[in-house]
Amino acid sequence: MRRDGARRRVYKAEQKQAVYEAFVEHHGSFGRRMLKRILERKSIHLSEYKISKILKELGVSPKYGRKRCKNVHTSKNTEHYIQQNLYAHLTDEEKSRMEVWSMDFTEEKINGKKIYTCGIISVKRKILVGYAQGSRCTTALAMEAFANAMLAHGIPDMVMTDRGSQFVSKDFHAMMEDWGIKHSMSRPYTPVDNRFIETFWKSMKVELGKKDLLNEATYRMVIEYYIFYYNNLRPHSTLGYTPPLAA
């Protein structure tokens, strides 16, 4: 009986180690559901209930808002650039065929200075296709991010944004027309319409945690690493728990 009990305790320790390593590997971001999938890929089969108990015994819990630019812009000079929510009216066949990008800004205060990041994600492929950073939340920064994305991934069929002033502008509208890209805008105060990039920003902020001790250069490096990690290593539930670039 003593030997059997010892074996059970050793096996339990191995389970704890496996769960903890998977938890740490992905920066403490995932809970029992995602950890179960990650462990299964390593031929370790534990129930969600068991994983939940182990996390509790280890005294750890998954992370899981966000500061951002104003997402609704109204001006008599630019209101004619406001677009409808075209994406909501696409058929499933069109969504599966078209390359649609979702883009938006997020901000972080580092050493008392605001740094804005404009990012763009592929709705279908879940790849962060491009981004740009700057000290101001401007149309120019949005256009720089878009140029970076097109350079790396070509021209999309449609772009989704909110109604922020950066997107309700003459220059951004002209860029969409020049490239023949359809522009879909969220309804006012309805971030769910542009949920794809919204979800990415939420995941990034939660998984990176506090950044109190970072300087600007280090923060930019951290963002660069996270985007690499997200595209190449982080499992994505809608892609069968494989990273976007491996799907």
Put a short name on every predicted segment.
Residues M1-S96, T190, L245-A246:
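Basic, flexible linker segments flanking DNA-binding modules
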Residues V19, L35, I51, Y87, ...:
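Mobile genetic element proteins and their domesticated derivatives, centered on retroelements
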Residues P62, K182-H183:
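Hydrophobic beta-strand scaffold residues
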Residues H73-T74, T161-R163, S169-M176, H183-K205, ...:
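RNase H-like two-metal-ion nuclease catalytic core shared by retroviral integrases
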Residues T91-V129, S135-R136:
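An active-site-proximal beta-strand-loop segment
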Residues K113, Y131-H153, V168:
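Active-site beta-loop-alpha junctions of metal-dependent nucleic acid enzymes
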Residues R125-Y131, S184-S186, K210:
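Short small-residue beta-strand/loop micro-motif enriched in glycine and branched aliphatics
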Residues E177, K202-A247:
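C-terminal domain-tail junction helix/linker
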